[in-house]
């Protein structure tokens, strides 16, 4: 504490380096009488203003090189930016922080950038006294048993049909298999809108990889969810950074007990990006796909699960087929069967402007009986048997026509 000219005591904030510099100046001043304070005493160190602290927040990225980690901004799609606050990695280790956690903190500002001095909250919880959370990979995976209701309007046929043909549960790993221009993006939008309307407890994230910039804009304007995108005008490395940090963010939320849904468009383009960036293993599959290129995309898609001890992660991803690319076919074949729900879109249905363009015989959810009541399951089973006997185009036309007569799916099933 120092006594100022007004007689008040002021607290001084000096770094060790600044203190050494001040002490060196005092030694020089003691040798120069003209530099001494009245009475011959050394002049006190100048009062230091308290550091310029400001609140900062963001998603923790510990993978950056150097002594500091960074707080990435959602509005910048989790990509590096000039205003990202830095946080010393020794502080990260001290607080046992994990990649992808959302932090609020106080930082000493240096222009636009800040250096975190104190962490206040981690994923919405006070950092002091916060319970130790389990690690995602240590959680027990179970079959989805809690249904995600998508039906949310008489005229929303996409979600009403999905509820009957390929229902989703919390922790589902669903693959939308789609040829070009079959309506996969519209389907993702409808799913997002339904979940936001019916399940406010689910945190919805939309992850767009290598999409056209105008598609990104349309998605952001269509749904009020967290949209993270690396559009087609970005570097391939950006696609990987966004996808992997978004996954880590979702995993941390699940560890803290939250239910999360990621809508990923598309797995095919994500796999292409990894194929381009991965170090060559020396072994190339058909279509020019490196044998190691699909490991990380599979890890991302395979993260979807329901857990016993914590929350759930639902992933609905799209896979492209009939693009004329042998690589895309190989990617689809590698992912086929890795999910526990599959929705196949039909080009012929789309060309006839029949939406949703779902191929009913090729679509469905494994162990769907766990998502329906016994009565519902018997009715849905009967419906599938009826529709299976006709061609896909006729089946979807008939289903949409019948559904339009009823306000709710339950009313429709009761009449079967």
Regions found by a protein language model. Name each.
Residues 70-74, 86, 118, 220:
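Short, acidic/hydrophobic/Gly-rich beta-strand patch recurrent on exposed beta strands
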Residues 80-89, 152-158:
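Short, structured beta-strand/loop micro-motifs enriched in basic residues and often containing a Trp
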Residues 89-96, 165, 177:
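Short, surface-exposed secondary-structure edge patches
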Residues 91, 107-112, 180-181:
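Short, charged beta-turn/beta-strand-edge "cap" motif at the junction between a beta-strand
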Residues 109-176:
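P-loop NTP-binding catalytic core
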Residues 174, 183, 192-195, 200-416:
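P-loop NTPase catalytic core
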């Amino acid at each position: 504490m120092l006594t100022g000219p007004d007689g008040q005591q002021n607290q001084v904030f000096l770094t060790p380096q600044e203190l050494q510099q001040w002490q060196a100046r005092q030694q020089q001043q003691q040798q120069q009488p003209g530099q001494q304070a009245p009475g011959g005493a050394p002049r006190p160190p100048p009062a230091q203003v308290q550091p310029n602290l400001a609140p900062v927040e963001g998603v923790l990225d510990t993978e950056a090189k150097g002594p500091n980690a960074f707080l990435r901004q959602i509005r910048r799609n989790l990509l590096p930016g000039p205003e990202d606050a830095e946080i010393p990695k020794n502080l990260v280790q001290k607080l046992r922080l994990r990649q992808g956690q959302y932090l609020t903190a106080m930082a000493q500002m240096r222009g636009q950038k800040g250096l975190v001095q104190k962490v206040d909250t981690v994923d919405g919880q006070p950092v002091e006294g916060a319970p130790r959370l389990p690690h995602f990979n240590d959680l027990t995976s179970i079959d989805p048993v809690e249904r995600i209701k998508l039906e949310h309007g008489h005229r929303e046929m996409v979600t009403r049909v999905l509820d009957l043909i390929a229902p989703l549960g919390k922790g589902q790993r669903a693959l939308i298999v789609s040829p070009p221009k079959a309506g996969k993006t519209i389907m993702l939008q409808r799913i997002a809108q339904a979940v936001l309307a019916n399940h406010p407890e689910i945190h919805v994230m939309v992850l767009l990889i290598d999409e056209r910039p105008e598609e990104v804009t349309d998605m952001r304007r269509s749904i009020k969810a967290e949209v993270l995108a690396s559009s087609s005008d970005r570097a391939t490395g950006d696609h990987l950074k966004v996808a992997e940090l978004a996954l880590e963010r979702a995993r941390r939320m699940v560890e803290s007990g939250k239910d999360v849904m990621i809508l990923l468009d598309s797995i095919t383009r994500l796999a292409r990006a990894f194929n381009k960036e991965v170090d060559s293993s020396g072994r190339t599959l058909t279509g020019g796909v490196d044998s190691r290129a699909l490991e990380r995309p599979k890890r991302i898609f395979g993260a979807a699960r329901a857990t016993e001890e914590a929350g759930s992660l639902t992933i609905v991803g799209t896979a492209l087929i009939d693009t004329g690319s042998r690589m895309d076919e190989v990617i689809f074949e590698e992912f086929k069967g890795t999910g526990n729900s599959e929705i196949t879109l039909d080009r012929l249905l789309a060309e006839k402007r029949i939406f949703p363009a779902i191929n009913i015989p090729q679509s469905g959810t494994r162990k769907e009986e766990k998502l329906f009541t016994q009565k519902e399951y018997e009715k849905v089973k009967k419906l599938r048997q009826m529709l299976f006997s006709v061609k896909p185009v006729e089946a979807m036309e008939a289903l949409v026509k019948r559904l339009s007569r009823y306000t709710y799916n339950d009313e429709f099933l009761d009449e079967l």
